[in-house]
Amino acid sequence: MNRTTPRTTPRTTPGTTPPASSSSPASYVAPGAARRWKPSPFVTGSAALHVGAAATLVAQPALWPWAVGSLVTSHLALVAAGLWPRSTLLGLNWTALPESAGRQIALTIDDGPDPEVTPRVLDLLDRYDARATFFCIGDRALRHPHCVEAIVARGHAVENHSQRHRHNFSLLGPRALEREIAAAQQTLTDISGSRPLFFRAPAGLRNPFLEPVLCRLGLHLASWTRRGFDTRTRDATLVTQRLLRGLGPRDILLVHDGNPARDARNQPVVLDVLPRVLEAAAATQLRCTTLRAAIAPGAEDA
């Protein structure tokens, strides 16, 4: 199996261990295998600050304003890191494909499956001979298992986007996070016949408890390089411009087959956006692949 690291770390050769950094564990383990959690320097620093503040309160009670101020600042920094979807401060986060991907890009499609939109998206992908990664919601997969089966049958990958896509996901504690993610893992494995290797948080928002949970479940966090905001924007041209501005090799793109915005004709915007993006990618010799094919090729059949 080739071992690769995110864009934020130096390229390594197969069989080597990448160096530790804020976005890569000291001992890299490919997606699909449980790994030992190692807190990032940012999380370690925050924990040390908490210990220092507590020690200060015991030794010098008069310095309580400093201690409280330090704790508030630390908590605000942790919250800010969780509200930044592409941040690597809280742990490993794939924001781009590894260097070994060459001129490949990853098209990721979130919040489905949707019985109206997903089949039409699959038809478009077939037309352009493109492969995509579908981050599916467990509850929706249970309601529309035929869509999940079609995704896999047509050569695409199904990954974990939580069981219920809870809007308070980033506020959950470790046990609730694990229940939510593990439930989706079981649901999607049962329906697709393949165990998800990657997880994407609802809206990309998370907290420091997420990375240890993903380590136990053998999942890696994946966000994106650029997104179109196609659940809010009804103008397909504007969505396309956001996705294509600066598009290059190894980019991870985000669009939606679930809850897509609709244009003036009441058509899902994504159906107008995809042909433009796929044609532009082909014109610049960029080929769409799945996350697992680019990052964990040895685990494609996991």
Question: Over which residues does each language-model region extend?
Answer:
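C-terminal domain-boundary segment and adjacent tail
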Residues: 82-100, 128-129, 142, 264-302
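N-terminal membrane-anchoring alpha-helices
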Residues: 2-8, 12, 16-17, 22-94
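Acidic-and-aromatic substrate-binding clefts and catalytic sites of carbohydrate-active enzymes
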Residues: 112-116, 136-144, 167-175, 200-208, ...
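His/Asp/Glu-enriched short active-site or ligand-binding loop at hydrolase and phosphoryl-transfer sites
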Residues: 205, 211-247, 286-297
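A short acidic, helix-capping loop that chelates divalent metal ions and anchors anionic groups
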Residues: 165-172, 260-264
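A cross-domain feature marking catalytic cores of carbohydrate-active enzymes
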Residues: 109-111, 136-138, 160-162, 200-203, ...
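Active-site beta->alpha N-cap acidic-glycine motif
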Residues: 82-169, 180-183, 187
